[in-house]
């Protein structure tokens, strides 16, 4: 099996309609439709165009980070993201989509932001800025900045830092997974282990407690310890194995 070494836009995305550890329906939708749904659920169509663009780029970057790092599949789940804001972004099945938001997403769905010097899409956290406050983008704050004349990238740099850059026209392809469908454990070897190690190293940038391991393709003791640390962080059984 293979996995893209660079970020890509998935043709479709599978959304778990509830918290990750609870049973709920999985819904697979075209990726642009997912972004349109989340944007229509999270922000207001009457906002300034630059605020809408900034929020759409943040929404897209966040979910692409989930896809690229295999955040949920690496924990054994069969979906890319959930529908709940306690973990991810608000997704409401079969909701109405605002026309101007739909048109903007058609233009922007294959663009995302990242940090300079990094390949992965930015895990662009955001909150409404009124009833909830976070370290990322303030949705209402972005509207205020847009009303002051800020461009979409100026708004994003205000919240995420001056070292972010815009990637445009990313390739579109089917979702691929590095986990082969059978357990990877101490002694395993092959391309699947190589991509497991690469994925762990990407995740370790946001969770520095996870030790960096060489991408050798051999599931050695250092890899096992990195897996155990990952499992402890995400409240999984720390058995040092991927898959059961």
Regions found by a protein language model. Give the residues of each.
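Conserved, single-site charged/polar hotspot
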Residues: 1-244
């Amino acid at each position: 099996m293979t996995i893209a070494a660079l970020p890509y836009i998935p043709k479709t995305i599978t959304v778990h309609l509830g918290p990750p550890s609870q049973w709920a329906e999985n819904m697979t939708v075209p990726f642009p439709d997912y972004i349109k749904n989340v944007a229509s659920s999270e922000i207001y169509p009457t906002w300034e165009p630059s605020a809408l663009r900034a929020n759409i780029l943040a929404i897209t970057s966040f979910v692409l980070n989930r896809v690229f790092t295999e955040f949920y599949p690496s924990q054994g789940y069969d979906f890319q993201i959930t529908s709940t804001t306690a973990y991810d972004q608000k997704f409401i099945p079969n909701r109405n989509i605002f026309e101007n938001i739909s048109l903007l997403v058609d233009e922007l769905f294959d663009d995302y932001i990242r940090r300079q010097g990094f390949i992965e899409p930015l895990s662009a956290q955001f909150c409404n800025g009124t009833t909830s406050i976070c370290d990322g983008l303030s949705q209402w704050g972005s509207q205020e900045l847009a009303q002051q004349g800020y461009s979409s990238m100026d708004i994003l740099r205000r919240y995420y830092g001056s070292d972010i850059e815009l990637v445009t026209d990313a390739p579109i392809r089917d979702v691929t997974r590095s986990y082969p469908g059978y357990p990877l454990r101490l002694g395993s070897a092959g391309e699947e282990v190589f991509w497991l190690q690469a994925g762990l190293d990407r995740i370790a940038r946001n969770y520095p407690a996870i030790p960096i391991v060489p991408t050798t393709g051999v599931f050695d003791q250092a890899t096992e310890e990195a897996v155990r640390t990952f499992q402890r962080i995400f409240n999984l059984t720390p058995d040092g194995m991927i898959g059961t």
